[in-house]
């Protein structure tokens, strides 16, 4: 998708805020551990390459979701460790070795496929994934973990780490978290051969369960300044939201009582009012169900009226503002603030999704 560079809609990313957030979280951790910056999904919509370069001196490596995301970083000159959290195709092992990428091994079945590949396994770096209760990928028993590690050792693979992922670390009820933690700790303690690196701490675990950290952490949503729990749990240290979303009025008109706006004529004016049009829509990740949400114009809240279209949306203005007036959809304007969590709450989703949905049509400015 081509960025719309000639359209007045932009996502501004404060890289210094991301750096400051990492510093605060690292100081919150009770011991020195290895730090991975999670930059999957285009760094949660913030721009993977720009973010990775900005935090290079603060982290030991990066986590991505897939091989393509890892290759993007390598092609941009990022040479620190990159851990691919998802499972890659066994047929792509040579690419992983060529670019010195660390892969995740999650099952014996996959390993049997990998053994058929003609590659130099002594150059392959892996972390073993344990499914302690998340239910997606990973070995699910001590016997399976020991068998997998034994085969990897026989193959001459560089076994660097073992890890798991918590399903409820951002919730006030700790029952499931404690169950997963106990399972993982017992499994690691009983391994016939324990890898040097052990990690289970995502953003939420690093914030609210820092006493459970092993010797590495994976920092994702928190480095971008967002609370993993939404507003359910209080942050133990203040963070700054790094991304703001702005557009500008491209059309302003006055409508009369009875006039309708948008697809389905879902909004009908009750009286004479001013309406402004913004060049942003659901193709940009500003979803169709945002009718009724408020944006900021000259520091005042204005309602989105009518259904959000593919490329445009309309707002009810307090007065006839001139074309080119800035409109803030996420961020601060004057004394008022709209957060990604506010958007998420309105949509009935999570702040992660709000940022990840922002499409490549929206240019990022740093």
From Swiss-Prot:
It catalyses: L-alanine = D-alanine. InterPro entries: Ala_racemase (IPR000821), Ala_racemase/Decarboxylase_C (IPR009006), Ala_racemase_C (IPR011079), Ala_racemase_N (IPR001608), Ala_racemase_pyridoxalP-BS (IPR020622), PLP-binding_barrel (IPR029066). The keyword Transport does not apply. Gene3D superfamilies: Alanine racemase, Lyase, Ornithine Decarboxylase, Chain A, domain 1. SMART domains: Ala_racemase_C. The modification N6-(pyridoxal phosphate)lysine is found at residue 40. One of its GO terms (biological process) is D-alanine biosynthetic process. Substrate binds at residues 136, 310. GO terms for cellular component: cytosol. Pathway: Amino-acid biosynthesis; D-alanine biosynthesis; D-alanine from L-alanine: step 1/1. CDD domains: PLPDE_III_AR (cd00430). The keyword Ion transport does not apply. The active site is at residues 40, 263. Keywords: Isomerase, Pyridoxal phosphate. Its EC number is 5.1.1.1. Its cofactor is pyridoxal 5'-phosphate. PROSITE patterns: ALANINE_RACEMASE. One of its GO terms (molecular function) is pyridoxal phosphate binding. Belongs to the alanine racemase family. This is Alanine racemase. It comes from Streptococcus equi subsp. zooepidemicus (strain MGCS10565). The gene is alr.
């Amino acid at each position: 998708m081509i960025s719309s560079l000639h359209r007045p809609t932009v996502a501004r990313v404060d890289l210094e805020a991301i750096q400051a957030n990492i510093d605060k979280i690292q100081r919150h951790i009770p011991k020195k551990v290895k730090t991975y910056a999670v930059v999957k999904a285009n760094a949660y919509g913030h721009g993977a390459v720009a973010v990775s370069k900005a935090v290079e001196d603060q982290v030991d490596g990066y986590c991505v979701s897939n091989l393509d995301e890892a290759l993007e970083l390598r092609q941009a000159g990022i040479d620190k460790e990159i851990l691919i959290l998802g499972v890659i195709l066994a047929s792509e092992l040579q690419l992983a070795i060529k670019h010195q990428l660390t892969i995740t091994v999650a099952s014996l079945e996959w390993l049997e496929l990998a053994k058929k590949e003609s590659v130099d396994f002594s150059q392959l770096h892996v972390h073993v994934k344990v499914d302690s209760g998340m239910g997606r990928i990973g070995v699910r028993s001590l016997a399976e973990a020991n068998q997998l590690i034994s085969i990897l050792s026989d193959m001459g693979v560089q076994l660097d780490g073992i890890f798991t992922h918590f399903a409820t670390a951002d919730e006030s009820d700790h029952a499931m978290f404690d169950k997963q933690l106990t399972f993982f700790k017992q499994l690691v303690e009983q391994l016939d051969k324990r890898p040097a690196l052990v990690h289970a701490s995502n953003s939420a675990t690093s914030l609210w369960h820092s006493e459970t950290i092993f010797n590495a952490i994976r920092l994702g949503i928190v480095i971008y300044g967002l609370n993993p729990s939404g507003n359910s749990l209080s942050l133990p240290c203040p963070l700054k939201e790094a991304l703001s979303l702005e557009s500008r009025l491209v059309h302003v008109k006055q409508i009369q009582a009875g006039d309708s706006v948008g697809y389905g004529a879902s909004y009908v004016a009750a009286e004479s009012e001013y309406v402004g049009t913004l060049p942003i829509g659901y193709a940009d990740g500003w979803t169709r169900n945002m009718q009724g949400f408020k944006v900021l114009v000259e520091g005042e809240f204005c309602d989105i009226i009518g259904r959000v279209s593919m490329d445009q949306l309309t707002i009810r203005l307090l007065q006839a503002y001139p074309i080119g007036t800035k409109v803030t959809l996420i961020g601060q304007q004057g004394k008022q603030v709209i957060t990604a969590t506010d958007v998420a709450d309105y949509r009935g989703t999570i702040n992660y999704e709000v940022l990840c949905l922002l499409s490549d049509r929206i240019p990022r400015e740093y």
